[in-house]
From Swiss-Prot:
<keyword id="KW-0677">Repeat</keyword>
<feature type="repeat" description="PPR 7">
    <location>
        <begin position="391"/>
        <end position="421"/>
    </location>
</feature>
<dbReference type="InterPro" id="IPR002885">
    <property type="entry name" value="Pentatricopeptide_rpt"/>
</dbReference>
<feature type="repeat" description="PPR 10">
    <location>
        <begin position="493"/>
        <end position="523"/>
    </location>
</feature>
<feature type="region of interest" description="Type E(+) motif">
    <location>
        <begin position="604"/>
        <end position="634"/>
    </location>
</feature>
<dbReference type="InterPro" id="IPR046848">
    <property type="entry name" value="E_motif"/>
</dbReference>
<feature type="repeat" description="PPR 5">
    <location>
        <begin position="321"/>
        <end position="355"/>
    </location>
</feature>
<dbReference type="InterPro" id="IPR046960">
    <property type="entry name" value="PPR_At4g14850-like_plant"/>
</dbReference>
<feature type="region of interest" description="Type E motif">
    <location>
        <begin position="528"/>
        <end position="603"/>
    </location>
</feature>
<feature type="repeat" description="PPR 4">
    <location>
        <begin position="290"/>
        <end position="320"/>
    </location>
</feature>
<feature type="repeat" description="PPR 6">
    <location>
        <begin position="356"/>
        <end position="390"/>
    </location>
</feature>
<comment type="similarity">
    <text>Belongs to the PPR family. PCMP-E subfamily.</text>
</comment>
<dbReference type="GO" id="GO:0003723">
    <property type="term" value="F:RNA binding"/>
</dbReference>
<feature type="repeat" description="PPR 1">
    <location>
        <begin position="189"/>
        <end position="219"/>
    </location>
</feature>
<feature type="repeat" description="PPR 2">
    <location>
        <begin position="220"/>
        <end position="254"/>
    </location>
</feature>
<feature type="repeat" description="PPR 9">
    <location>
        <begin position="457"/>
        <end position="492"/>
    </location>
</feature>
<feature type="repeat" description="PPR 8">
    <location>
        <begin position="422"/>
        <end position="456"/>
    </location>
</feature>
Length: 658
């Protein structure tokens, strides 16, 4: 190997500012034509540094083989004459091994590991980390077992294995590593403690995570940040904010990651006052303009209902990326400005702003899209044009968009063409079938999902129960509720029980629905009583209806639906005095019925309207058409259902009711 060529190759690929990291004599070789290059080799300091830079900057294809060749040419790296040279040589070999592992050359890394003239526990840790980094988990744990059996592990080994323990399935592994750390004494290492905290919280074992934290004699900012982040991930926002407050009173100063977690806690708990206080701290310490901090602030303000403050931050930012744009777009949609969110997205496209799949996925989640199939199809065209069709999250959004716009066929097409699906994909398609009344198709898809060993979630069962309710599959609905608890260990929520009540109510089994409510393991809320009352209203059951209404009045005294539904029951039974009392009580309490809004898309434009709407610019023409349609409907056999009319005018010619 020509050493002059090696040095020239190296320095030609290094920026001028980095070329000085090599010893001056190595750089001068290029200017010394009389130098005998066969006698020149890189020392361990230069070699280790270059190997590190090569891996960090992604220069492996150009420089990796050259550096490896230079190491092979140096006899000191094979047969060190003393302990110091042996130690230095081992550093070089481990640096080379790390380079191969980090660059995804796992096969070469294993081959190098087997052929290395010297190894230590760091060498094994590098290969172990390489296995995990390249998703060779099984091979990695085989090596770990061998390391543990021979006692050839250290605290870094434990932190490496804990780095992959980030789902509930790894909870037992985390506990085993914790026990091993205690037995080996490495539990006193702060890095091991920090990793244990992170793993426990990510596995959902928040109590164990707090236990590790409470037992640590030494803590640093990473420790406290790990606990705060873990609490937020487990939706313990109030606890996270309390710990953040205690942290600020102590001697540990928060870092940017800590502030991000604290802002996430404010977002999750909608604590805008605390969020504003954190904003002031960020301004005080001069880190409020960091891009990730700005995005977190926008998210906090928008989720706390202050979209104006979020927009102010967005307009003042010096740099915009896909994350900040997605945050402000979702913020607009969540605060009732769906149309503005779409217009914002269109302006982004017109301005030539580079968008990614996450932005498109966020746009597809805007409810305004659900009223405009034309706009949804345009977004689908954009997805194809930008080559986002392989993105699972985008496809999930397309499935939901098409089904909510009434196009079940295109929802199925997107689902079947997906190159990769996750549990959300299956849930979205099952929900689409349920939404369109295709209960049997939803159940069949669920069977396919379980056959492929895709684990269902509580959302899966919610959609399935909706499907059973709409097609009257009572026994199947009960079976699914039991399967949810007994087989999959998923605790039903109020929404699941409401589906069962709705299912029984649709079938006219009102007393059975009442008995089911009485047997619930949780206190019924207004959704449950409203479902029963709605069924009683449909079937005209005064006895159960009055009971459900009374319970609903106690749970939600300001609810207009309770008054309207019980009044409907009285109307259907001809109990006009009782109906009048209900309406009188409703007026005395100042309770008003919330106005429902409908919409329709005509020629790519969405029109929204309410009952007896007179504000539309074409209102007069619309009512003329409606007046002409009613006699045609009567001729076709339509008769108005007078059971639920609160006050019938008696004019059947135009169907006027109030």
């Amino acid at each position: 190997m020509n050493s002059r060529w090696v040095i020239q190759k190296l320095t030609s690929h290094l920026p001028s500012c980095l070329s000085t990291v090599l010893s001056p004599s190595k750089i001068l070789i290029r200017q010394s034509p009389n130098y005998q290059v066969s006698t020149f080799l890189l020392n361990h300091v230069d070699m280790s540094l270059l190997l590190s830079i090569c891996g960090r900057e992604g220069w492996f294809p150009h420089l990796g083989p050259c550096l490896h060749a230079s190491i092979i040419k140096n006899p000191e790296f094979f047969e060190p004459v003393d302990a110091d040279i042996h130690r230095n040589a081992l550093v070089v070999w481990n640096s080379l091994l790390s380079l191969y592992a980090k660059c995804g050359k796992l096969v070469d890394a294993i081959k190098l590991f087997d052929e290395m003239p010297m190894r230590d526990v760091i060498s094994q840790n590098i290969v172990f980390y390489g296995f995990l980094r390249n998703r060779e988990t099984e091979s990695g744990f085989v090596l770990l077992k061998r390391m543990l059996g021979s006692g050839g592990f250290d605290h870094a080994t434990l932190t490496i294995v804990l780095s992959v323990c980030d789902t509930p399935e790894f909870c037992l592994v985390t506990k085993m590593i914790h026990a091993l750390a205690i037995l080996s004494g490495y539990d006193k290492e702060i890095s091991v403690g920090n990793k244990l905290i992170t793993s426990y919280f990510k596995c959902g074992c928040s109590v164990s995570g707090r236990g590790v934290f409470d037992g640590m004699s030494h803590r640093n900012v990473i420790t406290l940040t790990a606990v705060i982040s873990g609490l937020i991930e487990n939706e313990l926002h109030e606890d996270g904010l309390r710990l953040f407050s205690l942290m600020r009173r102590g001697l540990v100063h928060p870092n940017s990651v800590t502030y991000l977690s604290a802002l996430a806690a404010c977002s999750g708990s909608q604590r805008i006052v605390e969020g504003q206080q954190i904003h002031a701290l960020l301004w005080k310490y001069g880190i409020e303009s960091e891009l990730c901090i700005e995005s977190a602030l926008m998210d906090m303000y928008s989720k706390c209902g202050s979209i104006e403050d979020a927009w102010t931050i967005f307009e003042s930012t010096t740099e915009v990326d896909e994350v900040s744009m997605t945050v402000i777009l979702v913020g607009l949609a969540q605060n009732g400005s769906e149309e503005e969110a779409i217009q914002f997205f269109i302006r982004m496209l017109q301005a030539g702003v580079e968008i990614d799949a996450n932005v498109v996925s966020a746009v597809l989640g805007v409810s305004f899209i659900d009223n405009s199939l034309g706009l949804g199809k345009q977004l689908h065209s954009l997805v194809i044009k930008r080559k986002f069709s392989g993105n699972t999250f985008v496809n999930n959004g397309l499935i939901n968009m098409y089904s909510k716009c009434g196009d079940l066929t295109d929802s199925q097409t997107v689902f079947r063409r997906m190159p990769k699906r996750n549990y959300v994909s299956w849930n979205s398609m099952i929900a689409a079938f349920a939404r369109h009344g295709h209960g049997l198709a939803a159940l069949k898809l669920y069977e396919e999902m379980t056959t492929l060993e895709v684990k269902p979630t509580d959302v899966t069962f919610l959609s399935l129960l909706h499907a059973c309710s709409h097609v009257g599959l009572i026994d199947k609905g009960r079976e699914l509720l039991n399967e949810m608890k007994e087989v999959h260990g998923i605790e039903p929520r109020t929404e699941h029980y409401t589906c069962i009540i709705d299912m029984l109510g649709r079938a006219g089994l009102l007393k059975e629905a009442k008995s089911f409510i009485d047997s619930l393991p949780l206190k019924p809320d207004c959704k449950i009583w409203q479902a029963l009352l709605g069924a009683c209203s449909f079937h005209g059951d005064t006895e159960v209806g009055e009971y459900a209404a009374e319970q609903l009045f106690q749970t939600a005294p300001d609810s207009s639906s309770a008054h309207i539904l019980i009044a409907n029951i009285y109307s259907s039974r001809g109990k006009w005095k009782e109906r009048a009392k209900t309406i009188k009580r409703m007026k005395a309490m100042g309770v008003t019925k919330e106005t429902g809004i409908s919409s329709i898309e005509i020629e790519h434009k969405t029109h929204s309207f309410v009952v007896e709407d007179k504000l539309h610019p074409q209102a007069e023409a619309i009512y003329d058409v409606l007046s002409g349609l009613f006699p045609v409907m009567v001729d076709e056999g339509y008769r108005p259902d007078k059971r639920f009319i609160l006050c019938y005018t008696g004019d059947d010619r135009n169907g006027t009711v109030s």
